[in-house]
């Protein structure tokens, strides 16, 4: 499940445990080839205009750099981090890049601009991992390789956490239907199962994700700078590109 709200307050209808687990496992595997071949391994992950998957997997998978849409990055900051590691005798680095990551003063990387005519954003994001890898290779002199997980993150066997969560949501949805309550979405609110009107969720969000300059005009729930994940990443030395 991966649906996010700007008006979340104490509401949570977003979880991506399986996707994060897949990305973290990929990072575990990339450590091996990165270390043995003295390379910069760049992993591009999904998430559209939000950096939840990138940030969580970077923490879980021991990445050195994590670039997310919410923090426009300065590639030189990533270079500094990589060079610091080299001075410590670590001739490889792991970089996680969210597909919606944006360079400072730049624009989002879009493979294909698509619009259904009703203002709905169907842009195909992707490719920023290659851009970052090329820049890092040129600026550090180290080989850089890119891995893009893409839809691998969305398939396969879900984690036990996601199985339990989806079952809880499904049971709650059935309960609501039997009560004749329609047009609602099951959520976790204040730690308990609840429901919210679809109108509150969707509202005017049919025109989400319109990219203007370097700004993704959307109503999705993004990582905030005071979130504990941001603090944790910084505390353990992950460079966020700023």
Q: Each predicted region: which residue ranges?
A:
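Single conserved hydrophobic/aromatic residue that forms the stacking wall/gate
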Residues: 1-13
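Histidine-centered active-site/metal-ligand motif
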Residues: 2, 37, 151
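Short, ordered loop/turn segments at secondary-structure junctions
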Residues: 6-7, 70-73, 99-102, 149-154, ...
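Short beta-strand elements at the ligand-binding edges of bilobed clamshell
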Residues: 10, 14-18, 157-163
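Accessory alpha-helical/coil subdomains and C-terminal extensions
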Residues: 16-35, 44-143
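C-terminal non-catalytic interaction/assembly regions of soluble proteins
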Residues: 124-242
């Amino acid at each position: 499940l991966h649906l996010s709200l700007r008006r979340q307050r104490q509401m949570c209808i977003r979880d991506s445990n399986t996707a994060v687990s897949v990305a973290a496992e990929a990072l575990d595997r990339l450590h091996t080839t990165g270390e043995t071949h003295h390379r910069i391994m760049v992993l591009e992950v999904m998430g559209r205009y939000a950096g939840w998957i990138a940030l969580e997997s970077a923490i879980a998978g021991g990445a050195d750099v994590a670039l997310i849409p919410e923090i426009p990055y300065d590639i030189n900051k990533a270079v500094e981090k990589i060079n610091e590691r080299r001075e410590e005798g670590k001739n490889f680095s792991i970089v996680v890049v969210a597909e919606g990551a944006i360079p400072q003063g730049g624009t989002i990387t879009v493979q294909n601009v698509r619009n259904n005519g009703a203002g709905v954003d169907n842009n195909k994001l992707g490719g920023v991992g290659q851009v970052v890898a090329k820049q890092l290779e040129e600026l550090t002199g180290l080989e850089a390789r890119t891995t893009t997980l893409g839809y691998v993150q969305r398939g396969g066997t879900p984690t036990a956490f996601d199985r339990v969560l989806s079952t809880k949501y499904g049971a709650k949805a059935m309960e609501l239907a039997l009560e004749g309550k329609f047009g609602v979405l099951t959520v976790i609110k204040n730690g308990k199962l609840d429901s919210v009107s679809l109108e509150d969720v969707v509202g005017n969000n049919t025109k989400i994700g319109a990219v203007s300059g370097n700004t993704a005009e959307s109503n999705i729930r993004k990582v905030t700078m005071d979130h504990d994940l941001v603090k944790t990443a910084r505390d353990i030395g992950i460079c966020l590109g700023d």
